[in-house]
Amino acid sequence: MAASTVLSTDDVAPRDRAPAWREWIFSHFGGLESDLYGDTDFDGHMAASHAGDVILTKLEANRHRVLRSPHLARASDTPYLKIVAPWQGSATVEQQGRQACARDGGWVIYDTTGSYAIANPERVEHLIVMLPKDQMAERGVRLGDLMARHVGGASGISRVALETMRTTYQELPNMSADAARGAGELIMQLVRLSLLELAGQETAMTQRAALKDRIRDHVARHLRDPDLSVEGI
């Protein structure tokens, strides 16, 4: 059976819940600041288990935001790629000037070695998956270009990855250590495949955008040319 960590504000005095939650978030996720949108009432629960080197955490909480500053990112000991996959509510991830939002049936990936912010503007139930970054490198794929992206989850390999992450978390209490390790390795492989697919989609979109730019530039330069035609473009 995989070892687990359970944290809950149920046994904490109401006035102490917010600071306790901030401390748990900071400790469990390796340096993460949080705030509660100014709310004074709060309740939250976290349950985390390991599938080999993969950490899976179910988080239930009132609305809150988290922030990883550049200083905290630099001070981190272990680099992870991190996934948020909501069961309830939404999560909006900001990193590297990009923003991506996920709800039930979707997931977003980001990098703990860089600064980021996540908004959870309503009560949420999230599955948060942490994958060792040094095991996720894929030849020919620039991971940085894929961070803060909505990877998917509705169909294809990204849906297989999502369902595997969810099922693994739910079944970890019934797994041996070896089985849990194998499940973690499977999750990493499915996420790699999802990122490869996303990289291909991003490349195709970039190529289409570049073609449109070239067409607009050609038309602008030859707008007064009587020989300008669709065939010429």
Task: Place the predicted regions along the sequence by residue.
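Glycine- and acidic-residue-biased ligand/ion/polar-headgroup-sensing regions
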Residues: 52-54, 61-66, 71-93, 106
